[in-house]
């Protein structure tokens, strides 16, 4: 078992005065404030998590916090993973906490990961061929997901059938089309019905060949309309108008106008919902097309990598589900006010409901969000490789760790003094306060972790015999708790020793 601790890890004295403290300020990724942001990539499994548990080792919270892997004490500075991955969208940003969970001693996996990174040039070219250039809109997708999956009033809001016994009719475009037409036509019917009642007496009298006079017409009209507001209004208005009759007349007219208002409001809501559904489905269609292309490019280049078999199998499975969604959404076009779009309302509602209710599609979409974040992270690593900010490591089970010209990640855009480290014996580092002792230790620990996750780090070269345990003794807070600082330091040392002994 190999174990490395932040307290004693160096083989020779390094000049700590040559290390500069980071002063960079991160470029913030814009996040929409209109819609609550959900972490859609939280349960995504990185390729490293497909390895056998015996080859996986967790990064403790102490180590993560001390090395500032995810968060920093200064909110204006980037975390260490941000310097490595350079996330450009929210999916990539939200996936970063998943990286800090594990590192591995599986050298075959690390070499396969290096091959994946080396294939990124071809991956990027394949993705951009045929002018395929989709700009992913994470905020829009988050908004769509909230509406599809987090809306408790989904069925009632979009006028779907809510009765469980016949809820399956929501998957019938024909039935949904009929319901939509009826809902859209109801305001017109309510408005036209009074005028039709005015015409019907003429038709009846003409059919019965009865001479048409105004008195006869009114009698027939009152008989026909006795259950409608017109008949009631005529019956009320033809007599003497008392106060109670006037109030009653106003009431029934007001009720009729309210009915028209409600119908028009419902019709307007349906129209706006149709525009929204069409917009959401078209966005999902474009995203799914992009995601399928993304997965196919990765599989084409990396399906033969042995340590990536499990990951590639999952990609293939979810890609098949996305193709089914793509087939369903192929008919969806940008919204335009036309008769053709009116006849498509049932189909749009069917597609929308299918995505809302299909559990397999939900899992595949969530996988695609995580996969997008993963590929964006890899592109950030590859960009660092192209710029020669980082280099690949070599692995040797017979020797000690030897890192040449390593430096602290936050100094990547500066001109740092680089240092060599050879871990064949313990050493003691000494320097004045703020001389860079902690920076050297953190640089070494970070590069070991990065190398055992991705096979590369912030150095010119590295030969590494993978470590199984990584401990940190960098930051022991002096709090007002029951432990003194000395007791807290002793307790941390005891925890590290116990872990080593148990292993």
Task: Annotate each PLM feature.
Residues 439-440, 482:
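Conserved ATPase-coupling elements of RecA-like P-loop NTPase cores
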Residues 469-503:
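Switch/coupling sub-region of P-loop NTPases
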